[in-house]
Amino acid sequence: MSAAKENPCRKFQANIFNKSKCQNCFKPRESHLLNDEDLTQAKPIYGGWLLLAPDGTDFDNPVHRSRKWQRRFFILYEHGLLRYALDEMPTTLPQGTINMNQCTDVVDGEARTGQKFSLCILTPDKEHFIRAETKEIISGWLEMLMVYPRTNKQNQKKKRKVEPPTPQEPGPAKMAVTSSSGGSSGSSSSSSSSSIPSAEKVPTTKSTLWQEEMRAKDQPDGTSLSPVQSPSQSQPPAACTPRETGLDSKEDENILSGDRVDGGRKVRVESGYFSLEKAKQDLRAEEQLPPLLSPPSPSTPHSRRSQVIEKFEALDIEKAEHMETNMLILTTPSSDTRQGRSERRAIPRKRDFASETPTAPLSDACPLSPHRRAKSLDRRSTESSMTPDLLNFKKGWLTKQYEDGQWKKHWFVLADQSLRYYRDSVAEEAADLDGEINLSTCYDVTEYPVQRNYGFQIHTKEGEFTLSAMTSGIRRNWIQTIMKHVLPTSAPDVTSSLPEGKNKSTSFDTCLRPSEKQEAEPGEPDPEQKKSRARERRREGRSKTFDWAEFRPIQQALAQERASTVGSSDSGDPGCLEAEPGELERERARRREERRKRFGMLDTNDGPGMEDTALRMDIDRSPGLLGTPDLKTQNVHVEIEQRWHQVETTPLREEKQVPIAPLHLSLEDRSERLSTHELTSLLEKELEQSQKEASDLLEQNRLLQDQLRVALGREQSAREGYVLQATCERGFAAMEETHQKKIEDLQRQHQRELEKLREEKDRLLAEETAATISAIEAMKNAHREEMERELEKSQRSQISSINSDIEALRRQYLEELQSVQRELEVLSEQYSQKCLENAHLAQALEAERQALRQCQRENQELNAHNQELNNRLAAEITRLRTLLTREGGGESTGLPLTQGKDAYELEVLLRVKESEIQYLKQEISSLKDELQTALRDKKYASDKYKDIYTELSIAKAKADCDISRLKEQLKAATEALGEKSPEGTTVSGYDIMKSKSNPDFLKKDRSCVTRQLRNIRSKSVIEQVSWDN
């Protein structure tokens, strides 16, 4: 019991009688796989890249529909958890988990999301929206995920009432899921008698290949076991023959032997999908497993789990250069032997193979254990068609050259039949495609020298695409990958249309140089060569030029015939050489010496070269064949007939066309356009050379005639030495006369033929000249058209660049104009404020002036009042003095006390008056000071007004200059663009009549001045009242 607690059951396996209990420990499912370590040991059964809607997205809200979906790598595990992470590495922590055991339904999400190929996973907690790029991928995911809601619904119906509801149900690892290329899928039933309808068939998707490979490798017998079918629907499958078992064993041995290349190295996964392939060709079969009760093998689950874990760890410990090694592996129809991708799987697979082979059934009657059945529930049925080689799926940074010669860096992704390129890897995740290269018509990938980096060209029927890589290794890797991708299906058979005599080592080099074309054998050129030549001429600006190679087969045939004829004539007759070798050598030496002497001379009598050469050959043979004089005469007639036949059958254009062939070849080799004068001079040189050859042949004819006479005489004397000399002389004279007549006839005929040949030569020369001129004209026209196209193209590009520059300048000028207008408005506003302040200052100055005038008036009034008081005081003093003098005489003794009192009062009154006068003087002086202060303020305000006015005038003048300058620039830009200059460009300025006044300021000034005046007046009135009192 303690051992059981220390070693709990680490893997849940559904009991065949109660699906919610484990068949090993009979504990509920929730007690298994509780921590992350257990979750990492779970077996993944499906995976791939999908797009996930962000959390909190409400697709009923139109604003949320424009949210960007997140690209994540989803992995569905056997325990029913659907996890998604940022990449496909098993060590990456998942960003979220969807518990498919609680899923209620998986429905199409296009109606809600507005996105194609989207699904909605409904759970009690929330809704999850996923989306794929293609219909095949989303169909495969729908097929896998639909198993869970069906299973959950059926388990809820079939549950026993005494059992408490469990939060998790058996995952799809316990269901039979067919491959997406042709198998059918369904959900497992709680009892063996029920079945679920199989899902819709979908084609193979990239995200399922790695899972199908693991299923194929887990089954050495090559079959997939599916419990979907009911006993009534299932049919007995074909028995596994020893031959099939041996084939699978051989294939596994190939994998085990070929997977020890790179152990312990880490590779970056080049593809967005798991780059795991099938190790062998699958066979379509489905088997129904009856419920068996035999105990399972305890070692098999651990080996299966360790195998899956090491398969996923293999993705994390491969190296980047491993992709290059995989490009060189050859694929066969029976197996896909792959090296390097599964080297870490070699030892676990050997252990797994050893543990499973004894239990593999060989016939339908072989019993299987319940553990075997449980293990078979998570396998998919295999397919018979070969899956695409995922090693060809490659991505990386390359630089592409565009038509204008500019290079731009892109993120390239190699897909099925296309090479797509994006702005970067983020754009690839968002499916933001920049362009695509169709590889279905690609027939070659070659290295191409470029100025920077390492370039290569992809040759397709649509054209050539120039790319470049950072290093030569990366370039070689890409070339091998693309070639391996396109060669098995679309590589053209270059050697099929070439002549047998041509060198077979030249493949994909169809554009021969002119010197190489001259050596090639005549025949119909390869269509690919024609296209390549056309492309070469198009690149060189000669797409419509005349092809001189059309004349070459006839010229080559004539040259070969002439060479063979001359060779045969030089060889001579063997009998003659044996008879008289020394004399023949001397004759030939003499002829060569005479020919060298006459080489520079021009003879008027021209003769056909081929006829004279053949005549010389036959005449050299004739001395050894003649016998009697009758035979000699007959032989002469026969030779004459033969010479006539030879003249009639000799092609007349041989002399004309053979010399012209070098002209054509030289024209094509140099690719120069000769003028008519140069062509005529060349033809004249060729004619002189032909005339020299004709004169040489005539001279050789005369020599041969002399030799013939000498030989005939020597032969006659040798054979008929005893014949009378007269008879010999008569016969010889008759024969010589006849022969001479024939020779004269032949010469006359030869002269007539020579005249005809000259006329024909002149006519053909004229025709060739006209043809050459027409060809040169065609070349000139083609070159002119090409130049016009290039010029038009360059003009268009220049105009577009100029338009863009002008548009940019116009935008810049408009922005500057707007900024100047804004500055002018600010200055105008400041000017308005200054003007308003000046107005306020002027009003304040005017108020000060009025107050000053009022003060002056009051001062005058006070002066008058003071003068009046002084006058009154003087009068009063005078009156008192007179009174005192008058009363002093009469009442000096009687009223001394009264007089003293009156004098004191008067003295006090006088002092008061003097103090009042003093106060008034002080007030007058203070008023004078205030007046001076007011005058100073006025002067300061006027100076400030002048400074502000001057500053504003300068600013306005500067703003006017800037506006006029910008108007001129804008006018020049609009004239350059061909538009009408803007009229009525208004600039807001300051209007003194429109400026708002500030009444509060005036009121404040007025109230201040009035308050001061009021204080002064009140003070003077109080003093006056006190003085009166």
UniProtKB/Swiss-Prot annotation:
Keywords: Actin-binding, Coiled coil, Cytoplasm, Cytoskeleton, Phosphoprotein, Repeat. Targets myosin phosphatase to the actin cytoskeleton. Required for the regulation of the actin cytoskeleton by RhoA and ROCK1. Depletion leads to an increased number of stress fibers in smooth muscle cells through stabilization of actin fibers by phosphorylated myosin. Overexpression of MRIP as well as its F-actin-binding region leads to disassembly of stress fibers in neuronal cells. Binds RHOA, PPP1R12A/MBS and PPP1R12C/MBS85 through adjacent coiled coil domains. Interacts with MYZAP. Binds F-actin through its N-terminus. It holds the Pfam family PH. Residues 152-267, 279-306, 333-383, 490-614 are annotated as: Disordered. GO terms for biological process: maintenance of protein location in cell. Residues 492-509, 562-571 have a biased composition (Polar residues). GO terms for cellular component: actin cytoskeleton; cytoplasm; stress fiber. SMART domains: PH (SM00233). This is Myosin phosphatase Rho-interacting protein. Residues 550-828 are annotated as: Interaction with RHOA. The modification Phosphoserine is found at residues 198, 224, 226, 230, 232, 271, 275, 294, 297, 369, 497, 622, 804, 981, 997, 1018, 1020. Residues 245-267, 338-354, 527-550, 583-592 have a biased composition (Basic and acidic residues).
